[in-house]
């Protein structure tokens, strides 16, 4: 009962909360104003810098136009005159250098012509060296006489004499060597060239039995003929041709043209490829 009277008392216990909220509100309201003031201060600094730069530009323009502006076109004319004078001086110096070079070249040409004229006379005045042959040993007369007699004795001998016994022996040796050569050549096997041929065997029509056709082709047996692999290649309209490989010795022509066993099945035989082995 002692605390019930406080219910009827009108006291604001949460006033500090509202005070804090009001303070924060006014702080937020005043915040942008301070930022804008700082922005205005920065803008004023930039404007001052721009004004200072303009003043410097105007001063520099005034300084460059001060002494030169009074001269005007006469200053430019004087500068051109000085440049032309310097170019003329340089031209004169270059002409002098060119003249010196021309004189040096003319002197060199004169010297070369003089050397060319004097070169034959110089060659004529040079002493000619005599060619001295090497010394030869002189043999004594006794040795010369001995060699002369020996040469006469050698001349008496007939190296190409026709002795019957020597002729028979030479003929026998020649015949023996020819016989040995013939035997050696006969023992050596003769090399026979071989060729690899790819044949195109075409049937009469699409009803031809290709297996029987291939059997007929392989039935052809000749010396030096070896049949290889084969395959069927379509030609058109249901007709197929037989491609067969064979190795033959180069002693006869087409093997199938000589055979009459395959005429019932084979229309034609063509050589598709030919290679030497």
Swiss-Prot record:
The modification N6-succinyllysine is found at residue 117. The modification N-acetylalanine is found at residue 2. The modification Phosphoserine is found at residues 37, 44, 60, 86, 106, 119, 133, 162. Keywords: Acetylation, Elongation factor, Phosphoprotein, Protein biosynthesis. GO terms for cellular component: cytosol; eukaryotic translation elongation factor 1 complex. It holds the Pfam family EF1_GNE. The modification Phosphothreonine is found at residues 129, 147. Residues 149-168 have a biased composition (Acidic residues). GO terms for molecular function: guanyl-nucleotide exchange factor activity; translation elongation factor activity. The modification N6-acetyllysine is found at residues 17, 107, 117. Residues 113-171 are annotated as: Disordered. CDD domains: EF1B (cd00292). EF-1 is composed of 4 subunits: alpha, beta, delta, and gamma. EF-1-beta and EF-1-delta stimulate the exchange of GDP bound to EF-1-alpha to GTP. Belongs to the EF-1-beta/EF-1-delta family. This is Elongation factor 1-delta.
């Amino acid at each position: 009962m002692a605390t019930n009277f406080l219910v009827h008392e009108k006291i604001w216990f949460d006033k500090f909360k509202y005070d804090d909220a009001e303070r924060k509100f006014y702080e937020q309201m005043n915040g942008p104003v301070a930022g804008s003031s700082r922005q205005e201060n920065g803008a004023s600094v930039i404007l001052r810098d721009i004004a200072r730069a303009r003043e410097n530009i105007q001063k520099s323009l005034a300084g460059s136009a001060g002494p030169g502006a009074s001269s005007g076109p006469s200053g430019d004319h004087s500068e051109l005159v000085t440049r032309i004078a310097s170019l003329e001086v340089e031209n004169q110096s270059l002409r002098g250098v060119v003249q010196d070079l021309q004189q040096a070249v003319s002197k060199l040409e004169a010297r070369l012509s003089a050397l060319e004229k004097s070169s034959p006379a110089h060659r004529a005045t040079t002493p000619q060296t005599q060619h001295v042959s090497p010394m030869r040993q002189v043999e004594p007369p006794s040795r010369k006489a001995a060699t002369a007699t020996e040469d006469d004795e050698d001349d008496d001998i007939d190296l190409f004499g026709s002795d019957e016994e020597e002729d028979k022996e030479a003929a026998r040796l020649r015949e023996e060597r020819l016989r040995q050569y013939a035997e050696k050549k006969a023992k050596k096997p003769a090399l026979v060239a071989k060729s690899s041929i790819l044949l195109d065997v075409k049937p009469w029509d699409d009803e031809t039995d290709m297996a029987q056709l291939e059997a007929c082709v392989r039935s052809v047996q000749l010396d030096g003929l070896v049949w290889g692999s084969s395959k069927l290649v379509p030609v058109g309209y249901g007709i197929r041709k037989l491609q067969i490989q064979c190795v033959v010795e180069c002693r006869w022509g087409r093997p199938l043209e000589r055979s009459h066993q395959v005429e019932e099945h084979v229309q034609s035989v063509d050589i598709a490829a030919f290679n030497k082995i």
